[in-house]
Amino acid sequence: TKEFYGDCFKALKSSGIMVNQHESPYYPNDALAMQETHKKIKSVFPIATVYQAHIPTYASGHWLFGFASKNLDPVADLKMNWNSLGLKTKYYNTDLHKGCFALPNYVKELLNNV
């Protein structure tokens, strides 16, 4: 509910983030649920965006997540010094981080209608 996301907003510090599952955009009922959820979050948080991951064990394999914050933009505020930390991961890198927020056109269209 909008009240729930309002409570999340109140609970977060200025540097806090909220992440939630936004379902699969592939199936009409899930896409509608994603739109309704994103609309509620956007009405509460000044920064609200969507990112994606491909998870083969999930229905359709294409899954969306919501990102919301009072002050932090997940791409613009990405600290590039991550690359200088010398952390070796099998999956994560800053290019992938930015790429997760690049959405296919059909998802952009769903979000434009919110």
Functional labels for PLM-detected ranges:
Residues 1-14, 42:
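A short glycine-rich, Lys/Arg-flanked "PGG" loop and its adjoining helix->strand segment in the class I
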Residues 59-61:
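Short acidic/glycine-enriched loop/turn segments that link adjacent beta-strands
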